[in-house]
Amino acid sequence: MSMYFVGIDISKYKHDCCIISAADQQIVSKFTVKNDKDGFEHLLTTLNSLSNPEDIKIGFESTAHYALNLELFLENAHHSFMEVNPVLIKEYKKSTILRRTKTDSVDCESIARWLMTVEYKPHSKGFYHSYSLKSLTRLRDRLIRQRSFYLVKITNVLDHTFPEFKPFFNERLSKTAIYLLENYGSAEKMAHMNSASYDKLRCASRDKFSIQQFLRLKELAANTVGVNNSIFDIELNSLLTLYNSLCKEIKTLEAEITKLIEEVHPHYMSIPGIGPISAAVIYAEYGDISNFSNPGQMLAFAGIEPGINDSGTESHGGRMVKHGSSQLRYVLLNACLPLIRFDITFATYYAKKRAEGKKHRVAITHVAKKLIRVIYALERQDVDFNVQKLR
């Protein structure tokens, strides 16, 4: 049975396909597939006429969301596919084509021929969960950034109306602080709060807001240097509405993210400090760990590795390259904070790096590298985290 290599050049409204036979390395077919149901059915009919799905290797460049529908269609039709880094295809074309030609027809043929030169690594079967979690976790990240933006805007309003308010709460707008702003808003109203107001406030803070704090806040409100202006009240109410709306959406997203990651339940969820949200980001960004040959590739993917400067008689390491997903890097580094507090092995490793003279952030980076090695080992060995086996 002959093997076939299928290169697909992805674009928004159409996909150009090239099929090459492994037997004689000749082009079997070149055609264009529209990005609709009829086009996809035409592609499937063509593929099914060639051979069994196991004998067909499909590849296309990783092109953001334009390939999503095709990927899901191929997965449901039991055809494997391999996503290719566009940089690799560009370099391959440079080495095989002398003319500076850039057409969809040439690109799809280059992808097909490139597939013949490399080890075929099809996309993992859990594509639905991987893509869904990537979409949801990145949306959550954007919403959190928006929420932070509105918190800054709320602070700007308070600088005019009640500048003593935020310092009273140690520069943090906690749930108790937000409750006060929602129910009273202005310093004038807070200055006139009574015992009934305190009872409600105490319940809202779960008995954490003392009567002494309450009286101190009333005093600050009565003697504030802020201005009492209805325009600022309107602005504050609008910002609080937007802030609360984002909080609600983030909570809904987190529930869905938790549900999806629990269905997959990767082994690294058993590591202390990696909760459902962190695990979801790691799973979404890394995908199938088996696609990585060693932990070093995972380090490079996350951008947690030093740059290397080797020229002439000089050779030294540089700063962390910070390539790849910033969200993944952030989650991995943050996951190390509880690890060095509650896990003796990671804590000892962190202390060792600090004793070597490394600063806190540099030492945390080394802990993150160790964490990545642990994640790699857990998934490749198909076991949960066991502190007794950690070295």
Regions found by a protein language model. Give the residues of each.
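A detector of single, family-specific signature residues
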Residues: 1-391
